Amino acid sequence: MGRNSLCLLGGTFDRFHIGHEHLLTTCLEQSDEVQVWLIGDEIAQRKNPLVLSWEVRNDEISAWAEGAGFSERISLHLLKDKVGPAPTSKEADAIGCTLETLPTCEVINSRRQHAGLSPLNIIQVDHVSGSDGEIVSSSRIRAGEIGRDGCHWLGGAEMHIDQRMPAMLNDELKQPYGTLYEGPESNPSVAMSKALAIIGDESPKLIAVGDVCVHTLVDMNEIPDLAFVDGMTKREDWPSAADLDRTVFTSLSICTSPPGVITADLKLTTKLALSNSEPTLVVVNGEEDLAPLIVHLLAPLGCAVVYGQPGKGVVLRITTEETKENCRRLLDVFTREV
């Protein structure tokens, strides 16, 4: 088969990753030019509200194409339906796909033949596997499992080791990691109400860390999807911790994690709790102060994590790829416990 003149590609291309790179590169190896038809925001965000905007997705592909030296051979277009120009294009002679989208390409070719047009050469491209051997996909990235390079943010053998925080991180981790919403310490619902007003309906989970935060949310009848408590506040026993109505949580888990340590027990318990569809309470024997670090690394993108900042209010941080990158940077400094 000779080289193709113009290859068509269609899709969402959310969180442009190594699988997308492989798909585009393969089509470019067999074609002079490639038209990428990006699904518009209305359709894409109906599929998943966490899909990035068309403009951002367009810019990410453009930046990759420029860096790879393909700018002159790739053009980007808005796709408003499932098939775009493929059934009627007289310029295109090829179409790229993966195994899942192969049936759509076959339907397109059938429509072309009925219209008296030549069928498109189908370039079927294999998926790329991540570090765990599973397919790299935008959905797994949005689920918070892997980064765009196909590597787990936290997984494998690291899930089964204890890690101690070095003293050099003390000052950094004392600072609010997120947006601080201030309010009187005597009435934490004031600060919490400000934080809740910011969280969008599309957030997959509301996650609370700390007895005061969890107690406040329950009192406000805003039951978190996942909550961590250790019976203390300001590193002292908190008598009111016993008053928490645990019956609002469908599932209860208990783990151990001493102060300054992230244990395998905490990691595995957090991962399991995040998979629960019902409200889950995690009781930490020890200290839950470092739980947000693990939560952000394991949680789906878009999750809202709240914790208390003593004497100041409530800190809210949304789990994003940037959040995961920073938490990964911090955990890389932790030392392994023997």
What are these regions (language model features)?
Residues 1-193, 199-202, 211-220, 231-232, ...:
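Nucleotidyltransferase catalytic core that binds NTPs
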Residues 91, 222-224, 301:
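Glycine-enriched alpha-helix->loop->beta-strand junction motifs that scaffold or abut catalytic
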Residues 101, 288, 296, 305-310:
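Short alpha-helices
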Residues 149, 300-303:
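Short helix-capping/linker segments at secondary-structure and domain boundaries
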Residues 196-197, 217-218, 294-297, 304-305:
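A generic local secondary-structure boundary/capping motif
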Residues 204-207, 225-228, 252-253, 279-283, ...:
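Structural motif
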Residues 212-213, 218-279:
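Acidic/Gly/His-enriched mid-domain segments of enzyme catalytic cores or analogous surface patches
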Residues 264, 284-301:
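Long, charge-patterned amphipathic alpha-helical coiled-coil/hairpin "stalk" segments used as oligomerization
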